């Protein structure tokens, strides 16, 4: 046996452990422990053999420490307490012929979320405790092979961290229940959870000019069923699908953001990229997972922007098989999501809110499931004046500016066009001030020198530079479709 090789392997194992290369360190430790074991078998002197056994025991303890570090690092990735090694003297005696008593599970009622006056949806009961353990649930029971004291320490530490975070955020003492993604890929669940708009987009109804009919319908579809659950039953059940149709820039996405802010429901903002995957069968699984999560976090609003890109007309020559499967799964889930139709409880409803600029490309079956189809038109004269006030409320206006006169000149402009006009006009004074100045002189300008009021000439000049983005032929096409398929 080469003693120099044993020393070299032990040295490398310790060096790799100090450098953080724990996998290589464990390999060297295992090798040197086996070499010492074989060397001890060849020794005849008891004193020498005892010394080598002591060296082997010390290296074995070092190996266990490295292994414990690796286990701790893995536990951080798995989001659960690490599995520390337990010595034999700490392990109670167990008779292999006798089953141990069952470990009592902790039954904690899930706290309320979003609305304090509504009942919290209970956790899913159809998933076993074993499946919950695979995904590292927060309500996971402690394993019998862990020390009880360590489990108590981790639970107490977790409660302290949560309490500290709630105090810092000004939140309530309750924690939001987590969706149990057993049976689904963890990455898919996390991708959809990122699409939950947990923080308000800060868009209110007052920030949207005009569109009173659309606001009224959305309040009726989302807010009123939560306020009057006893009324919205049977034939009065809430609408399970609303489609907003109109030319670009008329405020469809703004209405969806206002729903997320004002209505107090869980809001999923979904796009075509969210429900698309390169792997076969995964897109359909994403659609099914989306609606299962929506039912769990109900009441929920699922907003699908540009829905024509996901569920266009089926049966065309250029349709791909994978696209057809996704459309079929979406139609099935929407038909089975009927909110009050399923559980007769409007507070557990799931509503699909969709927006499109090409309603004529939408599949007929999807059009039927989107029960309310409303037209979001170009703003009226009153709406254009309100939009000018909203867009220019943060800047100073010259006294000669009359927004009603500017609104009359913007007939045929969309809301986005009017916003662009206001933005361009607010930059006119800055452009005049920095004209002909060097970069050093521009940087030396004070904020007060740039805060010049917006004049009537600035708005008229911006109006000449920016043309309409919607043609009369497009408007006629939308109005014709609404006459044939509208349901306001």
Swiss-Prot record:
<feature type="compositionally biased region" description="Low complexity">
    <location>
        <begin position="128"/>
        <end position="138"/>
    </location>
</feature>
<dbReference type="InterPro" id="IPR015415">
    <property type="entry name" value="Spast_Vps4_C"/>
</dbReference>
<dbReference type="GO" id="GO:0005819">
    <property type="term" value="C:spindle"/>
</dbReference>
<dbReference type="GO" id="GO:0015630">
    <property type="term" value="C:microtubule cytoskeleton"/>
</dbReference>
<dbReference type="InterPro" id="IPR050304">
    <property type="entry name" value="MT-severing_AAA_ATPase"/>
</dbReference>
<dbReference type="GO" id="GO:0072686">
    <property type="term" value="C:mitotic spindle"/>
</dbReference>
<keyword id="KW-0067">ATP-binding</keyword>
<protein>
    <recommendedName>
        <fullName>Katanin p60 ATPase-containing subunit A-like 1</fullName>
        <ecNumber>5.6.1.1</ecNumber>
    </recommendedName>
</protein>
<dbReference type="Pfam" id="PF21126">
    <property type="entry name" value="KATNA1_MIT"/>
</dbReference>
<dbReference type="GO" id="GO:0005813">
    <property type="term" value="C:centrosome"/>
</dbReference>
<dbReference type="Pfam" id="PF09336">
    <property type="entry name" value="Vps4_C"/>
</dbReference>
<dbReference type="Pfam" id="PF00004">
    <property type="entry name" value="AAA"/>
</dbReference>
<dbReference type="InterPro" id="IPR003593">
    <property type="entry name" value="AAA+_ATPase"/>
</dbReference>
<keyword id="KW-0963">Cytoplasm</keyword>
<dbReference type="GO" id="GO:0042802">
    <property type="term" value="F:identical protein binding"/>
</dbReference>
<feature type="region of interest" description="Disordered">
    <location>
        <begin position="95"/>
        <end position="179"/>
    </location>
</feature>
<keyword id="KW-0413">Isomerase</keyword>
<keyword id="KW-0206">Cytoskeleton</keyword>
<dbReference type="GO" id="GO:0008352">
    <property type="term" value="C:katanin complex"/>
</dbReference>
<comment type="subunit">
    <text>Interacts with KATNB1 and KATNBL1.</text>
</comment>
<dbReference type="InterPro" id="IPR048612">
    <property type="entry name" value="KTNA1_AAA_dom"/>
</dbReference>
<feature type="modified residue" description="Phosphoserine">
    <location>
        <position position="172"/>
    </location>
</feature>
<dbReference type="GO" id="GO:0005874">
    <property type="term" value="C:microtubule"/>
</dbReference>
<feature type="modified residue" description="N-acetylmethionine">
    <location>
        <position position="1"/>
    </location>
</feature>
<dbReference type="GO" id="GO:0005829">
    <property type="term" value="C:cytosol"/>
</dbReference>
<comment type="similarity">
    <text>Belongs to the AAA ATPase family. Katanin p60 subunit A1 subfamily. A-like 1 sub-subfamily.</text>
</comment>
<dbReference type="Pfam" id="PF17862">
    <property type="entry name" value="AAA_lid_3"/>
</dbReference>
<dbReference type="GO" id="GO:0008017">
    <property type="term" value="F:microtubule binding"/>
</dbReference>
<keyword id="KW-0547">Nucleotide-binding</keyword>
<keyword id="KW-0597">Phosphoprotein</keyword>
<dbReference type="InterPro" id="IPR048611">
    <property type="entry name" value="KATNA1_MIT"/>
</dbReference>
<dbReference type="GO" id="GO:0005737">
    <property type="term" value="C:cytoplasm"/>
</dbReference>
<dbReference type="GO" id="GO:0051013">
    <property type="term" value="P:microtubule severing"/>
</dbReference>
<keyword id="KW-0007">Acetylation</keyword>
<feature type="compositionally biased region" description="Basic and acidic residues">
    <location>
        <begin position="142"/>
        <end position="167"/>
    </location>
</feature>
<dbReference type="GO" id="GO:0008568">
    <property type="term" value="F:microtubule severing ATPase activity"/>
</dbReference>
<dbReference type="InterPro" id="IPR027417">
    <property type="entry name" value="P-loop_NTPase"/>
</dbReference>
<dbReference type="GO" id="GO:0007283">
    <property type="term" value="P:spermatogenesis"/>
</dbReference>
<dbReference type="GO" id="GO:0000922">
    <property type="term" value="C:spindle pole"/>
</dbReference>
<dbReference type="InterPro" id="IPR003960">
    <property type="entry name" value="ATPase_AAA_CS"/>
</dbReference>
<comment type="function">
    <text>Regulates microtubule dynamics in Sertoli cells, a process that is essential for spermiogenesis and male fertility. Severs microtubules in an ATP-dependent manner, promoting rapid reorganization of cellular microtubule arrays. Has microtubule-severing activity in vitro.</text>
</comment>
<dbReference type="InterPro" id="IPR041569">
    <property type="entry name" value="AAA_lid_3"/>
</dbReference>
């Amino acid at each position: 046996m080469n003693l120099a090789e044993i020393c070299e392997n032990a040295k490398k194992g310790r060096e790799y452990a100090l450098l953080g290369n724990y996998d290589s360190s464990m390999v060297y430790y295992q090798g040197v422990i086996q070499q010492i074991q074989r060397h001890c078998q060849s020794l005849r002197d008891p004193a020498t053999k005892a010394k080598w056994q002591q060296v082997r025991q010390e290296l074995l303890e070092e190996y266990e420490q490295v292994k414990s570090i690796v286990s701790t690092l893995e536990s951080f990735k798995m989001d659960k307490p690490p599995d520390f090694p337990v010595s034999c003297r700490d392990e109670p005696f167990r008779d292999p012929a006798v089953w141990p008593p069952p470990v009592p599970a902790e039954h904690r009622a899930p706290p309320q979320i979003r609305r304090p006056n509504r009942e919290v949806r209970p956790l899913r009961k159809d998933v076993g405790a074993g499946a919950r353990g695979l995904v590292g649930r927060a309500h996971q029971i402690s394993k019998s092979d862990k020390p009880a004291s360590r489990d108590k320490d981790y639970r107490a530490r977790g409660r302290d961290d949560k309490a500290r975070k709630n105090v810092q955020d000004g939140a309530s003492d309750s924690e939001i229940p987590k969706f149990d993604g057993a049976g689904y890929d963890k990455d898919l669940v996390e991708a959809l959870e990122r699409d939950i708009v947990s923080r308000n987009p800060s868009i209110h109804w007052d920030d949207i000019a005009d569109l009173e009919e659309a606001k009224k319908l959305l309040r009726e579809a989302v807010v009123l069923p939560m306020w009057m659950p006893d009324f919205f039953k049977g034939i009065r059940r809430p609408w399970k699908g609303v489609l907003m149709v109109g030319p670009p820039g008329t405020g469809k996405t703004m209405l969806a953001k206002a729903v997320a802010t004002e209505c107090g429901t869980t809001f999923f903002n979904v796009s075509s990229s969210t429900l698309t995957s390169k792997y076969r069968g995964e897109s359909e699984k994403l659609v099914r997972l989306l609606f299962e999560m929506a039912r769990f976090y109900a009441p929920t609003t699922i907003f699908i922007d540009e829905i024509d890109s996901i569920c266009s007309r089926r049966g065309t020559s250029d349709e791909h098989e994978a696209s057809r499967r996704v459309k079929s799964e979406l139609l099935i889930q929407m038909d089975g999501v009927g909110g009050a139709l399923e559980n007769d409880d409007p507070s557990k409803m799931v509503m699909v809110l969709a927006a499109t600029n090409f309603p004529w490309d939408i599949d007929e079956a999807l059009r039927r499931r989107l029960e309310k189809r409303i037209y979001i038109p170009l703003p009226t004269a009153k709406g254009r004046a309100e939009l000018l006030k909203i867009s220019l409320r943060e800047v100073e206006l010259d006294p000669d500016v009359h927004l009603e006169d500017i609104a009359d000149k913007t007939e045929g402009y969309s809301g986005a066009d009017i916003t662009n006009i206001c933005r361009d006009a607010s930059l006119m004074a800055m452009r005049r001030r920095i004209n002909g100045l060097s970069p050093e002189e521009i940087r030396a300008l004070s904020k007060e020198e740039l805060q010049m009021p917006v004049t009537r000439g600035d708005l008229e000049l911006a109006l000449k530079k920016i043309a309409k983005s919607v043609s009369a032929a497009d408007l006629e096409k939308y109005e014709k479709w609404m006459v044939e398929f509208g349901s306001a």
